[in-house]
Amino acid sequence: MMFSFIVHVFISLFAVSNPIGNVPIFLTLTEGYTAAERKAIARKAAILSFFILAAFLVFGHLIFKLFDINIHALRVAGGIFIFGIAYNLLNAKESHVQSLHHDEHKESKEKADISVTPLSIPIIAGPGTIATVMSLSAGHSGIGHYAAVMIGIAAVIALTFLFFHYSAFISSKLGKTEMNVITRLMGLILAVVAVGMIGAGLKGMFPVLTS
């Protein structure tokens, strides 16, 4: 049971963060950097992203109380939001919430350290990823549950680091067509996850649906 939940967490976060699709963005941002510099940036971005997502996992319930957020409403809203990202992925488009605006891209190129922004936020730990983590933590308080989500986060972040570290190699082996196929597959998986979140939220808001 716990293993299947960890797999669910991993698939959900992997699909919404889409580390494979972010490889071209990483290569663009680190153009002109040495392999060692790229590795250092990828490592720092991964560590920061892990702590950001872990913070939302641990303190998510406090955010619920502070803003009087209904758990079921969050699942519906988060599901709709994530479905929007899935729709863009299915059409091989970049999600606006995870892609860079012109000013952000220009600013990131002028800075020596891009690991905090835009890599950690919004590329790795973007709104969709944060919403997914908060939804997964909603309504649960057991240590085992939090540990399972934390393991899922760590696994996705570790894979993201590896994809960034070997980004040049991956880009040379996978053409644009292959990248689009993978992106659409991630979109399909994410759409299924989003529909499940919306369904769970609606059942919680309207118990009559379960009768």
UniProtKB/Swiss-Prot annotation:
InterPro entries per UniProt: Multi_antbiot-R_MarC
Membrane topology: Multi-pass membrane protein
Keyword list, A-Z: Cell membrane, Membrane, Transmembrane, Transmembrane helix
Chief subcellular location: membrane
Subcellular locations according to the entry: Cell membrane
Entry keyword Nucleotide-binding: no
Regions that span the bilayer: 1-21, 47-67, 69-89, 114-134, 150-170, 188-208
CC per GO annotation: plasma membrane
Domain of life: Bacteria
Family (UniProt): Belongs to the UPF0056 (MarC) family.
Protein name per the record: UPF0056 membrane protein YvbG
Gene expressing this chain: yvbG
